[in-house]
Amino acid sequence: MNEYFLLPLASLPFPNINPILIQIGPLAVHWYGVGYIVGILFAWWYAKRLAANPKLWPDGILPMKLEDLDDFIVWAAIGVVLGGRTGYVLFYDLPRYIAHPLDIFAVWQGGMSFHGGLLGVILAMTLFSIKRGIRTWSLFDVVAAGVPVGLGLVRVANFINSELWGRPTDVPWAIEFPNGGPFTRHPSQLYEALLEGLVLFVVLRILTHSRLKLKTPRFVGGAFICGYGLSRIFVEFFREPDQQLGYLLGTNWLTMGMILSTPMVLAGIWAMATAKPVKQAQPQAT
């Protein structure tokens, strides 16, 4: 039976939450923007807590000054926005932006790529750590540990916006999205919020505090990119592919998200497999 003609015995109505959290005159604050801002601020706050805890680091020596993280948040925000937008343009809708190049700057119309944002942050992190004399992987570890919270919030905002919904299904928890056509769908945004957000954060928390893996540079960062990649690939089996791309290579299952996430899994496995504990830490903080 064609999945697009399934008639579920029961489904859940869409909660129909206003995508605008606060409206003050012409100024509108959207849940999506709040998710990004709160996510960045939480990652910054959490990274400072990790970097300030001597029990988590080799010989109890902190890997960086807390002021470095205060300065890095600006670099990170720029990397997320520029990388996320550039990634979406290149990976998901290049023909459109070649035909209409000015639309690249119309970020209010939507269109951000996590994979592009990750590359943007990694570039910013590399340049920043070189400038400040910080071990790049240690910076990546503390930043990555708090990122899942922001990922989860943004996916919830995607759900509120009724965007990036899942494939048609007749499972009991299927959702009738207002712009999802005449069939019910997987709430794949919530699947991602659970896996990329809550589950991944808990896993990284265990690694940083119970397994003390911050003493092994790049292990936590590797676990993050591997964990995200695996979560994203899994959810892509339930998520509707981007309309302008559809399924790739003549299949009825392969998506761009899977292709972009596979190298992340491999890179994460490599990072964890080759990570070695620091024998003697170099003082960076006072």
From Swiss-Prot:
Function summary: Catalyzes the transfer of the diacylglyceryl group from phosphatidylglycerol to the sulfhydryl group of the N-terminal cysteine of a prolipoprotein, the first step in the formation of mature lipoproteins.
Domain of life assignment: Bacteria
UniProt protein name: Phosphatidylglycerol--prolipoprotein diacylglyceryl transferase
Transmembrane segments: 24-44, 72-92, 104-124, 140-160, 190-210, 218-238, 253-273
Main localization (coarse): membrane
Alphabetized InterPro entries for the sequence: Lgt
Localisation: Cell inner membrane
Species of provenance: Mesorhizobium japonicum (strain LMG 29417 / CECT 9101 / MAFF 303099)
Single Gene Ontology MF annotation: phosphatidylglycerol-prolipoprotein diacylglyceryl transferase activity
Assigned keywords, A-Z: Cell inner membrane, Cell membrane, Membrane, Transferase, Transmembrane, Transmembrane helix
Class in the EC hierarchy, top level: transferase
Bilayer topology annotation: Multi-pass membrane protein
Listed GO biological process terms: lipoprotein biosynthetic process
EC annotation from Swiss-Prot or TrEMBL: 2.5.1.145
Binding locations of a 1,2-diacyl-sn-glycero-3-phospho-(1'-sn-glycerol): R155
DNA damage recorded as keyword: no
Family as reported in the entry's similarity comment: Belongs to the Lgt family.
Gene Ontology CC terms: plasma membrane
Recorded metabolic or biological pathway in which this protein acts: Protein modification; lipoprotein biosynthesis (diacylglyceryl transfer)
